[in-house]
């Protein structure tokens, strides 16, 4: 029996932190385990560019978040920050063919770094965009020259800090 979306969300602590931009876009985490993640995104008219296809910035955010969650699936108590990301746009993500699905994979990790990749597929299963990314595992985010602050915890979630 497949794991329920609620169980995945609970195990991942949602996305683990409150990310208002991800909430605004409406991403839905559907897989979070074993170095893999899957996020579903149904673009709305406000997510399109002047050619009436999904905006590249929305696709890059989807790729970034799917790679980050793939990295975090191995260490869900840690946060990650993007160090580097390279994106290739292969074909337009045309609305109406169904939701987009990003499949992130953790290819390698060290104690502090994660090396990932992700592909966004359209509703017909065609690859629209692909990215590779490097992420740093963090317990806290730096703020200022010599200070740190905690990650924004998701609503109803208990911080591990």
Predicted regions located by residue number:
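Terminal targeting signals and extreme-terminal segments of soluble enzymes
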Residues: 1-161
């Amino acid at each position: 029996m497949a794991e329920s979306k609620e169980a995945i969300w609970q195990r991942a602590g949602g996305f683990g932190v409150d990310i208002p931009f991800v909430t605004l876009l409406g991403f839905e985490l559907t897989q979070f385990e074993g170095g893999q993640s899957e996020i579903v995104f149904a673009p709305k008219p406000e997510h399109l560019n002047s050619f009436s296809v999904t905006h590249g910035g929305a696709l890059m955010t989807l790729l970034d978040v799917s790679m980050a969650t793939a990295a975090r699936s191995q260490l869900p108590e840690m946060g990650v920050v993007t160090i580097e990301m390279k994106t290739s746009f292969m074909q337009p993500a045309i609305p109406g063919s169904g939701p987009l699905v990003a499949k992130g994979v953790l290819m390698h990790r060290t104690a502090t770094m994660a090396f990932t990749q992700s592909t966004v597929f359209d509703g017909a299963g065609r690859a629209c965009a692909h990215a590779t990314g490097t992420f740093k595992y963090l317990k806290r985010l730096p703020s200022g020259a010599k200070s740190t602050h905690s990650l924004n915890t998701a609503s109803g979630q208990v911080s591990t800090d």
